[in-house]
Amino acid sequence: MSRVCQVSGKRVQTGNNVSHANNRTRRRFLPNLHERRFWVASENRWVKLRVSAHALRTIDKNGIDAVLKELRARGEKV
C-alpha cells in the first residue's frame, strides 16, 4: 500500500539528515497517515480511507459527504 493520503494527496518527501559536522545523508519524510472508517449517513455505510492528519481536519471542516464528492469527481474509487 502506498504512503499517499487519499484526500489531500500528501506523499513521502525526501531530504537530508544533517549532522553537527554538516554531513548530509538522504532520508525520507513520511506523511502522518491513518486508516480511518467514516460513517456516511447518506449512503448508510462505512467508508474506509487512508488519510493524513491534515485531511482529518479537512473532513471535520467540510464534512465527509463533500470530501467523497470531490474524490469521486477526481475518479477515485471509494
UniProtKB/Swiss-Prot annotation:
<dbReference type="InterPro" id="IPR037147">
    <property type="entry name" value="Ribosomal_bL28_sf"/>
</dbReference>
<keyword id="KW-0687">Ribonucleoprotein</keyword>
<protein>
    <recommendedName>
        <fullName>Large ribosomal subunit protein bL28</fullName>
    </recommendedName>
</protein>
<dbReference type="GO" id="GO:0003735">
    <property type="term" value="F:structural constituent of ribosome"/>
</dbReference>
<dbReference type="GO" id="GO:0006412">
    <property type="term" value="P:translation"/>
</dbReference>
<dbReference type="InterPro" id="IPR026569">
    <property type="entry name" value="Ribosomal_bL28"/>
</dbReference>
<dbReference type="Pfam" id="PF00830">
    <property type="entry name" value="Ribosomal_L28"/>
</dbReference>
<feature type="region of interest" description="Disordered">
    <location>
        <begin position="1"/>
        <end position="23"/>
    </location>
</feature>
<comment type="similarity">
    <text>Belongs to the bacterial ribosomal protein bL28 family.</text>
</comment>
<keyword id="KW-0689">Ribosomal protein</keyword>
<dbReference type="GO" id="GO:0022625">
    <property type="term" value="C:cytosolic large ribosomal subunit"/>
</dbReference>
<dbReference type="InterPro" id="IPR034704">
    <property type="entry name" value="Ribosomal_bL28/bL31-like_sf"/>
</dbReference>
<dbReference type="InterPro" id="IPR001383">
    <property type="entry name" value="Ribosomal_bL28_bact-type"/>
</dbReference>
<feature type="compositionally biased region" description="Polar residues">
    <location>
        <begin position="11"/>
        <end position="22"/>
    </location>
</feature>
